[in-house]
Swiss-Prot record:
Pfam families: HMG_box (PF00505), HMG_box_2 (PF09011), HSR (PF03172), SAND (PF01342). Gene3D superfamilies: High mobility group box domain, SAND domain-like. This is Nuclear autoantigen Sp-100. It comes from the Eukaryota. Changing residue 165 to A: Prevents CDC20-mediated degradation. PROSITE patterns: HMG_BOX_2 (PS50118), HSR (PS51414), SAND (PS50864). GO terms for molecular function: chromo shadow domain binding; DNA binding; DNA-binding transcription activator activity, RNA polymerase II-specific; DNA-binding transcription factor activity, RNA polymerase II-specific; identical protein binding; kinase binding; protein dimerization activity; protein domain specific binding. Residues 677-753, 769-837 bind DNA. The keyword Acyltransferase does not apply. A motif (PxVxL motif) lies at residues 284-297.
Length: 879
């Protein structure tokens, strides 16, 4: 329903809400009284149905709003259909942006729609798009349908229905004239009248309750003659309109006094006789939508040329969504009186259950039944369902795959499958009577269940079918033998009185069945020859060809000479080898989410390794992998390798893949130039030569003389002596190492940032005037010698504390003496500093500064000269 049934759903609701209007369109033109009465009653029915739907809508507003999880396309569809204004649409959108729940917004919209409730509101609510986007609306829609069907008012009570049924039965028994016919009405079923089918195109109402109401109104308002005349004219007009269409909904029932059989002509055009004439003679309107009660019992076989047309109509309009429950409780005696039989149509996609409680029926008391949803289905000819269905199933198991084209079309053409029973019959005999309704039952993946009372009859039929099919397997062509005192559903045991149409179909199908028999025999001979070859090759005992090709729990397939596939020579026999990997693949772990909002060009990047988090500093990372460039959350510094170990990923030994930034590994960031390639610093390795001359002399000297102090001048002399004894090739190795170290030094110096050192103290002129002391310091200079004399062991801090205590305890008058003295010294300092600044720096001070600078330069020059001399001496020694 949600996939494409939006148009169907709204159409069905529309038909349920206005059924009387649909029926009004097909009344005869001359029946003005009936038309006037229908017009008056139409308003009452419409208002009643409107109230039912409106109350159900009002009660289920909360459920509808809860089923709609998002505003699109619900609000947009209502706005496009002009059911809500643009202002209301914008207000609803603003409410959703302000975090108001969508269900609350939808409920407010439904409350506004309640004020102007009409059919377009339901059409917009249950549209195709809404049913796809909001699947929870499906059961709400079904609730609307159920309420309409359940609460639809019935104009007649149950007693009147029983009287009408009894009147119908009496009219059929007596076979009176046209006055005895009445319009047959059908009470509503539990399921929708045309669920899963296309609504009628001719405008006829499919709901049974409205048809029943119309018939009741006709009965009450007109006399018996007028009633029969009006109903006959109405049915004639409806039958003429519905006849050309493919989805007819009305079937005429013809009752003959001389024969108890009933016939429902096919609405499709036939070759011999048109059903339109019979509709003019005896027209009884029957809605085949919802069938409650029908009984087809104890019928006699009759001949009709339109049987083939009926079977074709059922074949092409096969419905796969109905449950057919046939219940017939028969008496042991056989009568020619027709009794009602119940046919229930319930929810789609179920299994048909056939219950036959009386196994003692005679061949003249065969049952037939058929019910469909919207397509016209014809009452079947007399037959035995129990034996025919078992015969068809057993024959299907043994003759599966006779022809590829036939097997594909067999699901739709059930009469062709039934006619294949001529394979077991003589060529001169007639074919059995087959059920025309089995085409509607033969649906893929459908099961049949039979009651326990039929088990004995079914088992007897299956044994005879096994006997018939065994002759085909032997390829002898003999006729099947029939046990005594047992009924069989095959061709030889079926009663006479077959219609001429059946004879024609049976004769036309005998040619194809004989070809199938020849194919089966040829197939058996071919498999016997293959068995001989297999015996010669494998030295095994001879086995029957058909049994060899058969496997356990698999149906036997008979291939014809035309469609048999030749086996390729290069194709290997036996089972195919498993070429797939036998090892179970390791399941991939959950992917690490990637953060696209990180700016990788920052100098500091957040990194993670396992559950440990930290911050990577690019400036430190540039200096090398041995530098501690990652700071954890607890302010600890780590190298990349140490941070990898800290995150419990030390076993991988690949920090470029273990450490991630925003979900990306450091390797990816370095490849994309977001991180610089850090210089790899390796441990210094001491090269060893064959003569042990490339050993570090400093380390060797320490090992030999661990307690002796090493003088650098003496050590250089020893190194120069060993350098002279080394060959040129060995010196080249050291020269290469020196060049590599120099290049490494130059590369590091480009990115080296010297640490910020302390600022140099400004040069102070010793001849400059000094600042005067404060009053407290003058007090301390006077009393400090006294305290030290009294307490010689006191520290400086203790002395200062005591002096501070004494200063605080001194009276203000005593403090004035020190304060006045400090003020005089301050005035003198001001005069001296002013005179010093006016004169400028003295020459002596300038000379001292110049001398200090010269001495520094001289020291640097002397050190450079010494280095150059040492290099020259080393070069001379090499020469």
């Amino acid at each position: 329903m949600a996939g494409g049934g939006g148009d169907l759903s709204t159409r069905r609701l529309n038909e349920c809400i206005s059924p009387v209007a649909n029926e009004m369109n097909h009344l005869p033109a001359h029946s003005h009284d009936l038309q006037r009465m229908f017009t008056e009653d139409q308003g009452v029915d419409d208002r009643l149905l409107y109230d039912i739907v409106f109350k159900h809508f009002k009660r289920n507003k909360v459920e509808i709003s809860n089923a709609i999880k998002k505003t699109f396309p619900f609000l947009e569809g209502l706005r496009d259909r002009d059911l809500i204004t643009n202002k209301m649409f914008e207000d609803s959108q603003d409410s959703c942006r302000n975090l108001v729940p969508v269900q609350r917004v939808v409920y407010n919209v439904l409350s506004e729609l309640e004020k102007t409730f009409n059919l377009p509101v339901l059409e917009a609510l249950f549209s195709d798009v809404n049913m796809q986007e909001y699947p929870d609306l499906i059961h709400i829609y079904k609730g609307f349908e159920n309420v309409i069907h359940d609460k639809l008012p019935l104009q007649e009570s149950e007693e009147e229905e029983r009287e009408e049924r009894s009147g119908l039965q009496l009219s059929l028994e007596q076979g009176t004239g046209e006055n005895s016919f009445r319009s047959l009405t059908w009470p509503p079923s539990g399921s929708p009248s045309h669920a899963g089918t296309t609504p009628p195109e001719n405008g006829l109402s499919e709901h049974p309750c409205e048809t029943e109401q119309i018939n009741a109104k006709r009965k009450d308002t007109t006399s018996d003659k007028d009633d029969s005349l009006g109903s006959q004219q109405t049915n004639e007009q409806c039958a003429q309109k519905a006849e050309p269409t493919e989805s007819c909904e009305q079937i005429a029932v013809q009752v003959n006094n001389g024969d108890a059989g009933r016939e429902m002509p096919c609405p499709l055009p036939c070759d011999e006789e048109s059903p339109e004439a019979e509709l003019h003679n005896h027209g009884i309107q029957i809605n085949s939508c919802s069938v409650r009660l029908v009984d087809i019992k104890k019928e006699k076989p009759f001949s009709n040329s339109k049987v083939e047309c009926q079977a074709q109509a059922r074949t092409h309009h096969n419905q796969a969504s109905d449950i057919i429950v046939i219940s017939s409780e028969d008496s042991e005696g056989s009568t020619d009186v027709d009794e009602p039989l119940e046919v229930f149509i319930s929810a789609p996609r179920s299994e048909p259950v056939i219950n036959n409680d009386n196994p003692l029926e005679s061949n003249d008391e065969k049952e037939g039944q058929e019910a469909t949803c919207s397509r016209p289905q014809i009452v079947p000819e007399p037959m035995d369902f129990r034996k025919l269905s078992t015969f068809r199933e057993s024959f299907k198991k043994r003759v599966i795959g006779q022809d590829h084209d036939f097997s594909e079309s067999s699901e739709e053409e059930a009469p062709a499958e039934a006619s294949s029973g001529a394979l077991r019959s003589k060529h001169g005999e007639k074919a059995p009577m087959t059920s025309r309704s089995t085409s509607t039952w033969r649906i893929p993946s459908r099961k049949r269940r039979f009651s326990s009372s039929d088990f004995s009859d079914l088992s007897n039929g299956e044994e005879l079918q096994e006997t018939c099919s065994s002759s085909l397997r032997r390829g002898s062509g003999s006729q099947p033998q029939e046990p005594e005192n047992k009924k069989c559903s095959c061709v030889m045991c079926f009663p006479k009185g077959v219609p001429r149409s059946q004879e024609a179909r049976t004769e036309s199908s005998q040619a194809s069945d004989m070809m199938d028999t020849m194919d089966v025999e040829n197939n058996s001979t071919l498999e016997k020859h293959s068995g001989k070859r297999r015996k010669k090759r494998r030295h095994r005992s001879k086995v029957n060809g058909l049994q060899r090709g058969r496997k356990k729990d698999r149906p036997r397939k008979h291939l014809t000479l035309n469609n048999k596939v030749q086996k390729k020579r290069w194709q290997q026999r036996g089972r195919k080898a498993n070429t797939r990997p036998l090892k179970r693949r390791r399941k991939r772990g959950p992917r690490i989410p990637k953060d696209e909002n990180i700016n990788f060009k920052q100098s500091e990047l957040p990194v993670t390794c396992g559950e440990v988090k930290g911050t990577l500093y690019k400036e430190r990372f540039k200096q090398g992998t041995s530098k501690k460039c990652i700071q954890s959350e607890d302010k600890k510094w780590f190298t990349p390798r140490e941070f990898e170990i800290e995150g419990d990923r030390g076993a991988s030994k690949n920090w470029k893949l273990s450490i991630r930034c925003g979900g990306y590994t450091l390797k990816v960031l370095m490849e994309n130039k977001f991180l610089p390639e850090p210089p790899s610093t390796r441990k210094k390795r001491i090269l060893e030569s064959h003569n042990n001359t490339l050993v570090d002399p400093c380390e060797e000297h320490k090992k030999k003389n661990p307690d002796a102090s090493v003088k650098f001048s003496e050590f250089l002399k020893k190194c120069s002596e060993t350098w002279k004894t080394i060959f040129a090739k060995e010196k080249g190795k050291f020269e290469d190492m020196a060049k590599a170290d120099k290049a490494h030094y130059e590369r590091e110096m480009k990115t080296y940032i010297p640490p910020k050192g302390e600022k140099k103290k400004k040069f102070k002129d010793p001849n400059a005037p000094k600042r005067p002391p404060l009053a407290f310091f003058l007090f301390c200079s006077e009393y400090r010698p006294k305290i030290k004399g009294e307490h010689p062991g006191l520290s400086i801090d203790d002395v200062v504390k005591k002096l501070a205590g004494m200063w605080n305890n001194t009276a203000a008058a005593d403090k004035q003496f020190y304060e006045k003295k400090a003020a005089k010294l301050k005035e003198k300092y001001k005069k001296d500093i002013a005179a010093y600044r006016a004169k400028g720096k003295p020459n002596s001070a300038k000379k001292r500064v110049v001398k200090a600078e010269k001495s520094k330069k001289k020291k640097e020059e002397e050190e450079d000269e010494e280095d150059e001399q040492e290099e020259e001496n080393e070069e001379d020694d090499d020469k």
